[in-house]
Amino acid sequence: MAAGVAAWLPFARAAAIGWMPVANCPMPLAPADKNKRQDELIVLNVSGRRFQTWRTTLERYPDTLLGSTEKEFFFNEDTKEYFFDRDPEVFRCVLNFYRTGKLHYPRYECISAYDDELAFYGILPEIIGDCCYEEYKDRKRENAERLMDDNDSENNQESMPSLSFRQTMWRAFENPHTSTLALVFYYVTGFFIAVSVITNVVETVPCGTVPGSKELPCGERYSVAFFCLDTACVMIFTVEYLLRLFAAPSRYRFIRSVMSIIDVVAIMPYYIGLVMTNNEDVSGAFVTLRVFRVFRIFKFSRHSQGLRILGYTLKSCASELGFLLFSLTMAIIIFATVMFYAEKGSSASKFTSIPASFWYTIVTMTTLGYGDMVPKTIAGKIFGSICSLSGVLVIALPVPVIVSNFSRIYHQNQRADKRRAQKKARLARIRVAKTGSSNAYLHSKRNGLLNEALELTGTPEEEQMGKTTSLIESQHHHLLHCLEKTTGLSYLVDDPLLSVRTSTIKNHEFIDEQMFEQNCMESSMQNYPSTRSPSLSSHSGLTTTCCSRRSKKTTHLPNSNLPATRLRSMQELSTLHIQGSEQPSLTTSRSSLNLKADDGLRPNCKTSQITTAIISIPTPPALTPEGESRPPPASPGPNTNIPSITSNVVKVSAL
């Protein structure tokens, strides 16, 4: 048995690893290559970003641009690809829609730009996935509300020259700040609204007793004065209503509006009182009708942005308010019924009927608790507690929604006002720029350039130059003046804070640069003045005249206190060799290009020079590696020489 196992075991192992086939029949053929052909792979170039996909992927939606034959208009024969000059970031979402069948909205994209891209590719926004559709609709609604006022203002401003008299009047009523007359009428109507409301309140106040009569209110005691005030207010309100009705774009819509109804209700009691007789039967109805005069206070909504925002909030929260009213109605009916049957057995109970129990339920659910109706039984007290707790929950749930809507609308109005103010300021600046001449613009430009230069330098010489010459000419001359000094001479500046070495070259080559840096460090200075030393461009000895260009000439500045040996050593450390440079004329310089005719200089622009400036900035001894080994500096005195310190070398090349 063991011998038989040993005989076939190697063959089984060999077959397992593929050395010997186990089956005698041949293996079936491999499946045919079902991959897509190479010509079905298309390239979509969107603003330089290349996307590759299969043609059948795009043909899934033939009603769109990429799925129809219209995309052939965008085919480039040279590159063999479809080119679209569109946003590549949004196209990524579009291409994923063709691949997966689900359209998503990226939150970082502008909603208007996203809609434009979808409209270009022929994709409906309604097919956005459920995961992104709510976010898309919210962003779209917020954007529409934010831009509504801006579009209205733009349309009004664009059509201002062609406005008729009625349109101008309506625009003045809706936006009083368009003209002075509209603003005056706006404040006059606001004043009379306040007077009317105060009159309606004060006329009910008792004004004392008259001998032989009972106490009378002020409205009856001073009836003539109050009648005149009421007449004046009603006349103003009537004129305003008639003018608004005349100027309204749609009179039918204006009459149906809420503010129009408030205006009619506010002035109607006065005219009804004029035509009514002194009949006692109708006097009660007239008194009831006078109550509607209090609606004049709602006319303040035209003069208060906060009241308008509150009205918009209540209008936008109509569904939440309807839910609140429905919930309260259900709870009131349920708890009023329960309280009636719970207190029915008590003899001193005030819950005589279910409608009578409504009052207790409303007061309890709104957490007022007047105490005029109180349950006496144990069951009534328990149900009263449950009624109070349920009222808190029912009322508190819709309140955050209302508050959030109010905050949203308020901030939108704030941003709209800010945008209108910014746009008004921009239009004013553009108007000034258009009305101003080109010379005025150039003059302001020159002033701006000179102010920037004076802020950087702040030297008296430049200020004097700006006063005597043209601003741009002065700056250009100053630039060429500095360039001439740099290209014409090789300076060794003994400034304690700044050392500059320049040389003029045409054909140059660099030599031992490390040796130059080492020697330049050894030749730095250590005396630090209390004030900032002037630069080459602002030195008194250099700004008044233009120096001639000489090759490899060294000038020692007045504030130098280096010994002659050190000056000689720094002269020998030039990193640039001049090969075959011509000596320019001593009377010609680049700065003479902008000099006046009386300077007597002729321009010479035949040669071009390359300038290399080596700027050495000294560093304190404590910051240098060998600062610790050097002796401390002696106290300064009249005959004391301060040793030099190590410096950092910065090379600057300029044309």
Swiss-Prot record:
It is a multi-pass membrane protein. Residues 205-223, 278-283, 344-352 are extracellular. It is found in: Cell membrane; Cell membrane, Sarcolemma; Cell projection, Dendrite. GO terms for cellular component: dendrite; GABA-ergic synapse; Kv4.3-KChIP1 channel complex; membrane; postsynaptic specialization membrane; sarcolemma; voltage-gated potassium channel complex. Regulated through phosphorylation at Ser-569 by CaMK2D. Residues 70-78 are annotated as: Interaction with KCNIP1. One of its GO terms (molecular function) is voltage-gated potassium channel activity involved in cardiac muscle cell action potential repolarization. Residues 637-655 have a biased composition (Polar residues). SUPFAM superfamilies: POZ domain (SSF54695), Voltage-gated potassium channels (SSF81324). It comes from the Eukaryota. Residues 529-548 have a biased composition (Low complexity). Residues 1-182, 247-253, 307-318, 401-655 are cytoplasmic. Residues 472-487 are annotated as: Mediates dendritic targeting. The modification Phosphothreonine is found at T459. K(+) binds at T367, L368, G369, Y370. GO terms for biological process: cardiac muscle cell action potential involved in contraction; cell communication involved in cardiac conduction; chemical synaptic transmission; establishment of localization in cell; membrane repolarization; muscle contraction; potassium ion export across plasma membrane; protein homooligomerization. Residues 353-366, 367-374 dip into the membrane without crossing it. Its main location: membrane. It catalyses: K(+)(in) = K(+)(out). Zn(2+) binds at H104, C110, C131, C132. Pore-forming (alpha) subunit of voltage-gated A-type potassium channels that mediates transmembrane potassium transport in excitable membranes, in brain and heart. In cardiomyocytes, may generate the transient outward potassium current I(To). In neurons, may conduct the transient subthreshold somatodendritic A-type potassium current (ISA). Kinetics properties are characterized by fast activation at subthreshold membrane potentials, rapid inactivation, and quick recovery from inactivation. Channel properties are modulated by interactions with regulatory subunits. Homotetramer. Heterotetramer with KCND2. Associates with the regulatory subunit KCNIP3. Associates with the regulatory subunit KCNIP4. Interacts with KCNE1, KCNE2, SCN1B and KCNAB1 and DLG1. Component of heteromultimeric potassium channels. Identified in potassium channel complexes containing KCND1, KCND2, KCND3, KCNIP1, KCNIP2, KCNIP3, KCNIP4, DPP6 and DPP10. PANTHER family: POTASSIUM VOLTAGE-GATED CHANNEL SUBFAMILY D MEMBER 3, VOLTAGE-GATED POTASSIUM CHANNEL. Two N-terminal domains regulate binding to and modulation by KCNIP1. This is A-type voltage-gated potassium channel KCND3. It comes from Mus musculus (Mouse).
